[in-house]
Amino acid sequence: MEQQQQQLRNLRDFLLVYNRMTELCFQRCVPSLHHRALDAEEEACLHSCAGKLIHSNHRLMAAYVHLMPALVQRRIADYEAASAAPGIPAEQTRDSPSGS
């Protein structure tokens, strides 16, 4: 059940990114709706816009994948520190200036 929920969240996230990219590029590249078909300039603009956004998304995901292990280790250390100090809530330990 948890796996299905994760798959649904992934699909939702993908569709949100796709819809936002489509909206952004369409607003940027299609100034009028006077014709049914896109002209060559509009098609080239849409292709370039989508390509840039996809490339940016890939770079962000690569950075996220690179940084994620360090973030996980930090959260584990914060959790262990909070568990070691009885009577102090985990949120207080993590949010304190010395926990940064």
Swiss-Prot record:
Gene Ontology molecular functions: metal ion binding
Membrane topology note: Peripheral membrane protein
Cysteines paired by S-S bonds: C25-C49, C29-C45
Pfam family, one: zf-Tim10_DDP
Subcellular localization, as worded in the UniProt entry: Mitochondrion inner membrane
Motif Twin CX3C motif location, chain numbering: 25-49
UniProt keyword terms in alphabetical order: Disulfide bond, Membrane, Metal-binding, Mitochondrion, Mitochondrion inner membrane, Protein transport, Translocation, Transport, Zinc
Single GO cellular component term: mitochondrial intermembrane space protein transporter complex
InterPro entries: Mito_inner_translocase_sub, Tim10-like, Tim10-like_dom_sf
One BP term from GO: protein transport
Subunit structure: Component of the TIM22 complex, which core is composed of TIMM22, associated with TIMM10 (TIMM10A and/or TIMM10B), TIMM9, AGK and TIMM29.
Domain remarks: The twin CX3C motif contains 4 conserved Cys residues that form 2 disulfide bonds in the mitochondrial intermembrane space. However, during the transit of TIMM10B from cytoplasm into mitochondrion, the Cys residues probably coordinate zinc, thereby preventing folding and allowing its transfer across mitochondrial outer membrane.
PANTHER family: MITOCHONDRIAL IMPORT INNER MEMBRANE TRANSLOCASE SUBUNIT TIM9B (PTHR13172)
Similarity comment: family membership: Belongs to the small Tim family.
Its biological purpose: Component of the TIM22 complex, a complex that mediates the import and insertion of multi-pass transmembrane proteins into the mitochondrial inner membrane. The TIM22 complex forms a twin-pore translocase that uses the membrane potential as the external driving force. In the TIM22 complex, it may act as a docking point for the soluble 70 kDa complex that guides the target proteins in transit through the aqueous mitochondrial intermembrane space.
Protein name in the entry: Mitochondrial import inner membrane translocase subunit Tim10 B
Organism: Mus musculus (Mouse)
Gene behind this protein: Timm10b
